[in-house]
From Swiss-Prot:
This is Translation initiation factor IF-1. It is found in: Cytoplasm. CDD domains: S1_IF1. GO terms for cellular component: cytosol. One of the essential components for the initiation of protein synthesis. Stabilizes the binding of IF-2 and IF-3 on the 30S subunit to which N-formylmethionyl-tRNA(fMet) subsequently binds. Helps modulate mRNA selection, yielding the 30S pre-initiation complex (PIC). Upon addition of the 50S ribosomal subunit IF-1, IF-2 and IF-3 are released leaving the mature 70S translation initiation complex. Its main location: cytoplasm. Belongs to the IF-1 family.
Length: 90
């Protein structure tokens, strides 16, 4: 489990500044069930099952997932039952 911090670039008085956007928890899991082309059930490495959706870049590049695929999931600390799939392992 690893914590990642995303930064958002904003302009204030003509100067670009970075602002913390969100801290996420990154975990590895296995796709167990496919609800639609974008919604999945993922079993995490700590034996917790969550619902997850495909990130925008994955759907843009038509990356398909099937049950049994190993994936990286980012989870917000505010809602630990919903995640975003950001990478599919080969």
């Amino acid at each position: 489990m690893e914590k990642l911090t995303y930064y958002q670039e904003i302009t204030f008085n003509g100067k670009k500044q970075k602002r913390k956007k969100e801290e996420v928890i990154k975990m590895t899991g296995k796709v167990t069930k496919m609800h639609s082309t974008k919604n999945y059930d993922v079993l995490l490495e700590n034996d917790q099952e969550i619902k997850a959706y495909i990130s925008g870049k994955m759907s843009l590049h038509n990356i398909k997932l099937i049950p049994g695929d190993m994936v990286d999931v980012e989870i917000s600390p505010f809602n630990l039952t919903l995640g975003r799939i950001v990478f599919r392992h080969k």
